[in-house]
């Protein structure tokens, strides 16, 4: 009979421990439920806010069709703009004369597909509108300067070998259109003054402006006054072969042809060339913008010879 009280006390301790444990479990469940409720409420508020205040990306594809007459024949040009993939597609012609021009603003490429030739030509393009910069200071005539060439004096010539590695067009709309045809890079080739003189000697009837004022009026929409070219700078292109050049390929240096194709430097040039093109300045709307403000803006860049860059790294220039 004397051993019963300790047994009862031991049972009381066990009951108290179980009760305390159940209280801790209930308290933990309450805390977890409160945290879960706060998280759920936060997610609901974020979802509601993003739905009502976050600008939704339009999934609509914009299209436009233009009809015109050429040599008495009715022709159509259609344009399709996809703001999600940032592509712009132009279609013209029918059957074997059909041509597709794809502007991929996301990856910075332009693809031109000719159905009759079953060939695709690729060139690079800008991805964004360049920032406006102040006009350059006047350059001394006696200084070694570059020659300015405008887009009208550039011919796009395809490369001799087709493109083998197409991984750079993996996520581009161009690859979907040109996947089963041969693809070539096209490179800008400058028209020298000597070539224009050859046309005159052959008896071609070329209608050049008879006065300086008339020439400026005709080209006013293409050339801005800040980048007009002097005649003395044009004529220096004819004697370009007489200029000295440091050819580092004799020392075992080989230039990647992609440097020339992408426009980083010119492998076979003896002097730098200033290449100008007209860039469409947007009037708001979805990207890519199909509208140009006052015909666009002239953007120029200087492409130096690849040998010049090597000489600069060696400290020779």
From Swiss-Prot:
Residue positions where Phosphoserine is found in the record: 239
Ranges facing Cytoplasmic side: 1-30
Tagged with keyword Secreted: no
Disulfide bond recorded as keyword: yes
Compartments where located: Membrane; Nucleus envelope
Tissues where this protein is expressed: Highly expressed in tendons.
GO biological process: cellular response to BMP stimulus; endothelial cell morphogenesis; negative regulation of angiogenesis; negative regulation of endothelial cell proliferation; tendon cell differentiation
Gene Ontology cellular-component terms listed: cell surface; membrane; nuclear envelope
First-listed, main subcellular location of the protein, grouped into a coarse class: membrane
Extracellular face of the membrane: 51-317
One Pfam match: BRICHOS
Intrachain disulfide bonds: 120-178
Residues that span the membrane, as ranges: 31-50
Residues that carry a glycan: 94, 180
Keywords linked to the UniProt accession: Disulfide bond, Glycoprotein, Membrane, Nucleus, Phosphoprotein, Signal-anchor, Transmembrane, Transmembrane helix
UniProt superkingdom: Eukaryota
Stored InterPro entries: BRICHOS_dom (IPR007084), Chondromodulin/Tenomodulin (IPR043405)
Membrane topology (UniProt): Single-pass type II membrane protein
Domain BRICHOS, chain residue ranges per copy: 93-186
PANTHER family given in the database record: CHONDROMODULIN-RELATED, TENOMODULIN
Function summary: May be an angiogenesis inhibitor.
Sequence similarity: Belongs to the chondromodulin-1 family.
Name this protein carries in UniProt: Tenomodulin
């Amino acid at each position: 009979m004397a051993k019963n009280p300790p047994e009862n006390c031991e049972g009381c301790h066990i009951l108290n421990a179980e009760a305390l444990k159940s209280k801790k479990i209930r308290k933990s469940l309450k805390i977890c439920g409160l945290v879960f409720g706060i998280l759920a409420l936060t997610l609901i508020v974020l979802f509601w806010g993003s739905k009502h205040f976050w600008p939704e990306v339009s999934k609509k594809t914009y299209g436009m069709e233009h009809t015109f007459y050429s040599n008495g024949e009715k022709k159509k040009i259609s344009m399709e703009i996809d703001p999600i993939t940032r592509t712009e597609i132009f279609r013209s012609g029918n059957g074997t004369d059909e041509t597709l021009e794809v502007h991929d603003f996301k990856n910075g490429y332009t693809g031109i597909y000719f159905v009759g030739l079953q060939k695709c030509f690729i060139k690079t393009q800008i991805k964004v509108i360049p920032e406006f910069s102040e006009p350059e200071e006047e350059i001394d005539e006696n200084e070694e300067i570059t020659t300015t060439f405008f887009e009208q004096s550039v011919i796009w010539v395809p490369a001799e070998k087709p493109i083998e590695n197409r991984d750079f067009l993996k996520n581009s709309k161009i690859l979907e259109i040109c996947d089963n045809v041969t693809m070539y890079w096209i490179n800008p080739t400058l028209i020298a003054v000597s070539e224009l003189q050859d046309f005159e000697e052959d008896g071609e009837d070329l209608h050049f402006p008879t006065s300086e004022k008339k020439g400026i009026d005709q080209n006013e929409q293409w050339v801005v006054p800040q980048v007009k070219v002097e005649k003395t700078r044009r004529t220096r292109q004819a004697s370009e072969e007489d200029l000295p050049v440091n050819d580092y390929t004799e020392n075992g240096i080989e230039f990647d042809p992609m440097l020339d194709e992408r426009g980083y430097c010119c492998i076979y040039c003896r002097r730098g060339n200033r290449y100008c093109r007209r860039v469409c300045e947007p009037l708001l709307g979805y990207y890519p913008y199909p509208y140009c403000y006052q015909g666009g803006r002239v953007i120029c860049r200087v492409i130096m010879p690849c040998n010049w860059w090597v000489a600069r790294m060696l400290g020779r220039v």
